[in-house]
Structures are given as structure tokens and as C-alpha cells.
Amino acid sequence: MPTEDYDSKPSWADQVEEEGIDPEPISPPVTKVQQDPASFVLDTPQEVINGKIKTITEYKLNDEGKKIKIVRTFKIETLKASKVVAHRKNWKKFGNSEYDPPGPNVATTTVSDDVLMTFITSKEDLNNQEEEDPMNKLKGQKIVSCRICKGDHWTTRCPYKDTLGPMQKELAEQLGLSTGDKEKAPGAEPEPAQAPVSKTGKYVPPSLRDGGSRRGESMQPNRRADDNATIRVTNLSEDTRETDLQELFRPFGSISRIYLAKDKTTGQSKGFAFISFHRREDAARAIAGVSGFGYDHLILNVEWAKPSTN
């Protein structure tokens, strides 16, 4: 059988067996990691404690490859902490600080100033918008008027009370006017004459008794009109009197009735009152002017009175 001659190249394994030389192991390429000179510490940091001063000295290489010396000085302070904080400081460290002694390590911990946190409890603090002071609305408005000098103060606190007061009374007496006649509202109906009261003990018919000819208060036609022009004042002091309310609300219009709630035992004010005006417009101006006004170290609250259900 004919055979074909050809040149065969011996394999690499046959050559190794013939020569008896062990092949070199194939190893992966080695990558050389260059260490940052700034983080390379030449020597172990030296720690010296002198009283309450702690000094740590260490040597490093900077970016230019030069040897530098770093000295850190700490002041040791002893602070009292709660049990929870002391227990937290004894926790086992982990990571790069696993074998560090107690306390912060300058290599892994940065000690800085304390940061104070402010907790916001409501949305009003976020806006920080200054609300308008209700007292600013009353600036320039003449709420109180003195009867003696027409000044912006109470009559009882008038500096001319002892001089002008007697002169005005004497002049009114000379002109035939009384204080009660001056304070009456214009157009007011005169009060009916009272019937004589029997002092002999004889029987008097109801029609001839005092007030027998007058209608009941609930039958008056203008009672509902008074309810529509009645305001309610609250947060009054205990020393408030009807005369004080008269002086306070008289500048706004003619007043038909004032009711001040009082304690039956002490006679002091209970803190609220009802003022009825002849016109509803005057009552509205009184609410706008006196509501929020400071009186006797208290802030008055004035609102419309609810109509009576009786």
C-alpha cells in the first residue's frame, strides 16, 4: 500500500518529555497597585498624654514624596453622660476600627463642632409671616371721649376733672339743664307719669295701679328691633360698671339699653354684657371699633348677640 510522505511538526508535549524540562506555569498578568503617598504612614503614631492634654505624632509622605510630620493635640474633658450614652460607647467596633481602642480614631473619625437641630412643630413656623396686629387697626380712631375736655381718655382719669367739672355743672344749673336731660337721646318719648301710690291700705284696682296703663315689655313693637341692634361684650373685668360701658360705647351712637351680668352675692361683673343701640349701623361700628380693644388689661371681644327665643 503506497504511503504519502509529509513533514510532521512535533507537539509541544513531546518536546517536553524528550528534554525532561518542566514547563513554566501560566500565571495571570500581575497589576501593581500604587499606594497613595499621603496615606502611607512611615511609623506607628505616637500618643503622649500629659495631664488633660493628649498629643498624637505621626509621619507621612506627601504628594511630592517628602517626609512630613503631623502633630495633633487634643484636650481631654470629662463629661457626665446618661446610662444610654455610656452603654452606646461600649459597643463593639467593626470595619476598619474593629481593633481600635475605646474612643474616636483620627484615621476613621472626624471630630467637629456640635450641630444644633431645630424641630419645627407646625406649619405656621414655616411661613414665618407676621400677622397683622389688631391693635394697629385701632390707631388713629378715637374710641374713648372725655365728657369734660373731649379728650382721648376716660372721664374719671381727666386731668381737668377738678377744675372744669364743677364749672360745667354750675353752668348747666344756671341754664336750667341737668345732666340727665343732656344725656337723653333726641326724639325719645317722655316717660308716662306714675299714678299715686295708695298709702291708706285700701284696695286699688289693677288698672289704677302703678304701671297698669303700660303695656308689657314683651308686647312692645320695638323689642325685636332692639334684638337686631344688640351686641354682646365678653372678657370684661370684675370691676366694670354700667357707667364704664356707657362711656365706652356712647361715641358710636345712641344706646337704648345696657345689661351687665353681675354676681348676686358679690355684685361684681361676671365678665359679659349686652348693649342695645337704636340703630343697627351704630352697633356694627361699635363691633368694628371695640372688638380687640384693650380695656383694664384685658382684650375685649364684641360680637352680635343671638336673638331671644322668647
From Swiss-Prot:
Stored Pfam families: eIF3g, RRM_1
Subcellular location per the Swiss-Prot or TrEMBL entry: Cytoplasm
Domain RRM: 229-307
Description of how the protein assembles with itself and partners: Component of the eukaryotic translation initiation factor 3 (eIF-3) complex, which is composed of 13 subunits: eif3a, eif3b, eif3c, eif3d, eif3e, eif3f, eif3g, eif3h, eif3i, eif3j, eif3k, eif3l and eif3m.
Keywords, comma-separated and alphabetical: Cytoplasm, Initiation factor, Protein biosynthesis, RNA-binding
Biased composition (Low complexity): 187-196
Protein name: Eukaryotic translation initiation factor 3 subunit G
Species for this entry: Xenopus tropicalis
InterPro entries found in the cross-reference section: eIF3_g (IPR017334), eIF3g_N (IPR024675), eIF3G_RRM (IPR034240), Nucleotide-bd_a/b_plait_sf (IPR012677), RBD_domain_sf (IPR035979), RRM_dom (IPR000504)
A GO MF label: translation initiation factor activity
Lineage top rank: taxon: Eukaryota
CC annotations in GO: eukaryotic 43S preinitiation complex; eukaryotic 48S preinitiation complex; eukaryotic translation initiation factor 3 complex
Keyword Heme (UniProt): no
Region (Disordered): 1-32, 179-229
Gene3D superfamilies in alphabetical order: 3.30.70.330
Keyword RNA-binding: yes
Biological role: RNA-binding component of the eukaryotic translation initiation factor 3 (eIF-3) complex, which is involved in protein synthesis of a specialized repertoire of mRNAs and, together with other initiation factors, stimulates binding of mRNA and methionyl-tRNAi to the 40S ribosome. The eIF-3 complex specifically targets and initiates translation of a subset of mRNAs involved in cell proliferation. This subunit can bind 18S rRNA.
Xref: CDD domains: eIF3G (cd12933), RRM_eIF3G_like (cd12408)
Compositional bias annotation for Basic and acidic residues: 211-229
Sequence similarity: Belongs to the eIF-3 subunit G family.
GO biological process: formation of cytoplasmic translation initiation complex; translational initiation
